[in-house]
Amino acid sequence: MKLVSTEILIDKGPFSSSSDWQEIKTQISQAIKAVEWPPGSGSFTIRKQSGKKRGEGSGVKPIKAAFMAKLGDFGWNLETRVDIATVKTPGPLDATKPVGDKLFAVEWETGNISSSHRSVNKMAVGLLKKKLVGGILILPTRELYQYLTDRVGNFRELAPYFPMWRALNVDEGFLAIMGVEHDLVSTKVPRISKGTNGRALA
């Protein structure tokens, strides 16, 4: 799998010039690149099949699971509960890495566009409350989105709202959106079913 775009929404303070960010960026890039299909192929080939009809298209959650497993191998904490923007038990962040007394968070979108908004908002509030030093939401590009099941949030659909997050008055922190995409498209590979073990893809 490949990273094709990074949109930086907030970059305040020294973090993006730090060795911590260089390590985080490298690990995220390596974890994306490690996601492959079919297993053992060395690249990510998506089945050329629209996800609009029931029982067609490739599942999103196994792709996310493969990426998260690789971050776990790098020592990231998975499914971290951080009290950021909730009054009840907070929903977990997909992956976090300690940076000093704060956390850097990564979310990989498997829900719809409303879920994407919630993820970015949660990380933005984390910056405002100084609980996060930074955060990244990873989304499929529109090119990959068409082959995935369900109506998963995607980069192009979220882009019109980027100015809103850029306008936030954050003293210090980093917030970005990454777009990921397949390496190849083929009718000769199987679809990724929703029940596929994510470990098989990494």
PLM region descriptions:
Residues 82, 139, 181:
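Residues at the C-termini of beta-strands that transition into short coil/loop
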Residues 110-167:
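Catalytic cores of nucleic-acid endonucleases
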Residues 1-82:
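Interdomain/boundary linker segments immediately adjacent to catalytic/signaling cores
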Residues 93, 104, 175:
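A broad, low-specificity signal marking well-ordered, structured residues that form hydrophobic/aromatic
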Residues 105-109:
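Short catalytic-loop micro-motif centered on adjacent basic/acidic residues
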Residues 142-202:
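Domain-level recognition of nuclease-like catalytic cores that cleave nucleotide substrates
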Residues 50-58, 62-101, 112-121, 128, ...:
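Active-site metal-binding core of divalent-cation-utilizing nuclease and nuclease-like domains
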Residues 102-104, 134:
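Structural motif
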